């Protein structure tokens, strides 16, 4: 939840931006959730209704405008497959016009520890929301319960259940800790740089257990914490605890981002294995990550979704009548053998996308088992493209070839607009930097050209997933969805999420692959298809 003072500064800047900048494009993403109208930010209250087979997503919502503002509500959406979402009526509303139902989480009170439920409510649908009630005077933790499976909520009459005489105490994330048979809450003392850990028997009375403080990137404040047990990729029967903390403003690349720490939890204290802050997503547009309280085991035990924007420029991105999208849902695991460099293995969070689609077009194979040269670029036009595409690229670098550091030795992909090819995304890999780059600045949209915070160019360090026969192999999967690009490197060892904006109707569909150096890149596989 963004600090009000920071929003005041943003509002001042917004007043200087022409209104036309906010309405130049309105192409709605196909597989990333967007509200029907209004403003959306943090995901909240994620849970799975095992009785109905339905996923629930709540979110910070201003239905009255396309910028953040009070009163702020909990919007609501549901899904049968974690890809296609149905907007639902507002779930939780604040009590005053100058207040907000700020971020929080959902639990399923299977054993009715709260006493809110009777036997007529299926234990799998005993939903309790834990959320921050924000007023100009304070931020306090409230609870509300649902008797209809998460669609409407009744506020607990004795709220607040937790207060700290502070205007910067928010974002409770609650889970059940089976060894102690207690509820555990993490909540942010935002400007003290503390994530406080509380325990409870009944969701109503909370005891402070410990604090995880002053770790990693501090930025301006901590927000949206989360603590979850994440399985090992190598051995799913083993796991470690992961503490997620959001930072805004003050991200290394500007604005907002998510960091995480790997460690152990004993019901009282979270102890990180080291003091290293690790980055969840290396893009500019992935914030306020939250994980689901429970899941369908088909998808694993640790699933999360984030807001696909950045507070530096979120109020100005072109969109109408809604503003902002969510990321795809991602299953998380821990790669305990992640090769950070040739001499060091680290524990690393791994993420892959959930994309349940039945109407995708056929894969168009551009290149297989071929060496790329300057003369043989590969081109394809997906003439009926909707602007939602996915691609897979497996390539290798010839390590025996000597390249001058002064030469930009690149493999580039050019995703061009079908109506106007002068608008395009360029992305690719450059050998000397050993990084995958993105250029999202080739657009005629005024916001892209003029907003100083919308960074046009960025990159992500890449390491090969294997090396053999003098070739170092790399892999990238990408999903382009109208104005959101998600990139997954080496099966999700590294992830980057970024928004982009083209003129309305200029769907990306023409794809070119080029290189600036002969015989340096070997293309094992490159294929693209349309998502409908």
Curated annotation (Swiss-Prot):
Gene3D superfamilies associated with the record: Exo-inulinase, domain 1, Glycosyl hydrolase domain, family 43
Name listed for the protein in its UniProt record: Invertase 1
The family this protein is said to belong to: Belongs to the glycosyl hydrolase 32 family.
Presence of the UniProt keyword Cell membrane in the record: no
Residues in the signal sequence: 1-19
This enzyme's EC code(s): 3.2.1.26
Residues where substrate binds: 39-42, 60, 102-103, 170-171, 223, 311
SMART domains in the cross-refs: Glyco_32 (SM00640)
Top-rank lineage group of the source organism: Eukaryota
GO cellular component: extracellular region; fungal-type vacuole
Molecular-function GO term, any one: sucrose alpha-glucosidase activity
PTM notes: Isoform Secreted is glycosylated. Isoform Intracellular is not glycosylated.
Species in which this protein is naturally found: Saccharomyces cerevisiae
Catalytic reaction list: Hydrolysis of terminal non-reducing beta-D-fructofuranoside residues in beta-D-fructofuranosides
Gene: SUC1
One of the GO biological process terms: sucrose catabolic process to fructose-6-phosphate and glucose-6-phosphate
Pfam family name, one: Glyco_hydro_32N
SUPFAM superfamilies hit by this protein: Arabinanase/levansucrase/invertase, Concanavalin A-like lectins/glucanases
């Amino acid at each position: 939840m963004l600090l009000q003072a920071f929003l005041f500064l943003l509002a001042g800047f917004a007043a200087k931006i022409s209104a036309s900048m906010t309405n130049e494009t309105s192409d709605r993403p196909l597989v990333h959730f967007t509200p029907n109208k209004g403003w959306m930010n943090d995901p909240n209250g994620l849970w799975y209704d095992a009785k109905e087979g339905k996923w629930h997503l709540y979110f910070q919502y201003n239905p009255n405008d396309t910028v953040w503002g009070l009163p702020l509500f909990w919007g609501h959406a549901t899904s049968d497959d974690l890809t296609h979402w149905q907007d639902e009526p507002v779930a939780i509303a604040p009590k005053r016009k100058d207040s907000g139902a700020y971020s929080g989480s959902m639990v399923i009170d299977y054993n009715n520890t709260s006493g809110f439920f009777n036997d007529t409510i299926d234990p799998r649908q005993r939903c309790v929301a834990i959320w921050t009630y924000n007023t100009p005077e304070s931020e306090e933790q409230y609870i509300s319960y649902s008797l209809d499976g998460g669609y409407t909520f009744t506020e607990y009459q004795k709220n607040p259940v937790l207060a700290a005489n502070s205007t910067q105490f928010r974002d409770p994330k609650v889970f059940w800790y089976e060894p102690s048979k207690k509820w555990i809450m993490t909540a942010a003392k935002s400007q003290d740089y503390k994530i406080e850990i509380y325990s409870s028997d009944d969701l109503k009375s909370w005891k402070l257990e410990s604090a995880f403080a002053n770790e990693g990137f501090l930025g301006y404040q901590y927000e949206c914490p989360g603590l979850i047990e994440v399985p090992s990729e190598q051995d799913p029967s083993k796991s470690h605890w992961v503490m997620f903390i959001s930072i805004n403003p003050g991200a290394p690349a500007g604005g907002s981002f998510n960091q995480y720490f790997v460690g152990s939890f004993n019901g009282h204290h979270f102890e990180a294995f080291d003091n290293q802050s690790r980055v969840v997503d290396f893009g500019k547009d992935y914030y306020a990550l939250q994980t689901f309280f429970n899941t369908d085991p088909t998808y694993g035990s640790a699933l999360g979704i984030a807001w696909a924007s950045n507070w530096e420029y979120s109020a100005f991105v072109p969109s109408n009548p809604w503003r902002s999208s969510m990321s795809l849902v991602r299953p998380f695991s821990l790669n305990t053998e992640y090769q950070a460099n040739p001499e060091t293995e680290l524990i690393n969070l791994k993420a892959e996308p959930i994309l349940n689609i039945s109407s995708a077009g056929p894969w168009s194979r551009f290149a297989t088992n071929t060496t790329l040269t300057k003369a043989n670029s590969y081109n394809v036009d997906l003439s009926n493209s909707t602007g939602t595409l996915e691609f897979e690229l497996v390539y290798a670098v010839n390590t025996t070839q000597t390249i001058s550091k002064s030469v930009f030795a690149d493999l580039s992909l050019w995703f061009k607009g079908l109506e106007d090819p002068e608008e395009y995304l360029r992305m690719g890999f450059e050998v000397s930097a050993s990084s995958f780059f993105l250029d999202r600045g080739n657009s005629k949209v005024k916001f892209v050209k003029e907003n100083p915070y919308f960074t046009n160019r960025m990159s992500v360090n890449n390491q090969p997933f294997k090396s053999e026969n003098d070739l170092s192999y790399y892999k990238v999967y990408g999903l382009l969805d109208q104005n959101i690009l998600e990139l997954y490197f080496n099966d999700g060892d590294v992830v980057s999420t970024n928004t982009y904006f083209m003129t309305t109707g200029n769907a990306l569909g023409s794809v070119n692959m080029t290189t600036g150096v002969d015989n340096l890149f070997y293309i094992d596989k490159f294929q693209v298809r349309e998502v409908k």
